[in-house]
Amino acid sequence: KLVHQHEYEKSSAIVNDGGGMYVYLNTYSVEVQKYAPPQYTLSAIYYVVHTSHYQAEIMENKLTVNYDANYSLATLIKSSNMMNPSPSMLALIEASESKSGLFMSSTDSAIYTLDGALKRTPSLKNTRNLPIHRKNILMYDLADAMFMAAYQQHFDDIVVQ
């Protein structure tokens, strides 16, 4: 599933032939690691495809995301309405931006040429359990696409009772 795309400008000083960056999620690779609502952990394989005159490759990565539905947007709205019947939209936005309830770790698996030949296998470097902020659209959308593939609903639609 195409999760993100960015087309490079042809008139750019760095890139003169266009191209772009495309991020794909292998929805068949999504695995449930933990199911203990409101806590969830999923892992999946995703690909970052770079196409330009200076970089043409496919990077394969494994992503593990920990979800805490106590911080889903629907839960934040519900709890905000319970505490204050007319919450300020600004307070709600600040709360949603400060904690998304998502944490990730990623591992580089392999790098391929555009025709699928193995280019190199990077040393396995894991990132620590880093927060995914809603402003980080690429990683947030990737985490949400994983949740959608596993549970057929968006993470931010989950309401914790």
Feature map (PLM): residue ranges:
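N-terminal secretory-pathway/extracellular module detecting exported/lumenal segments
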Residues: 1-62, 67-161
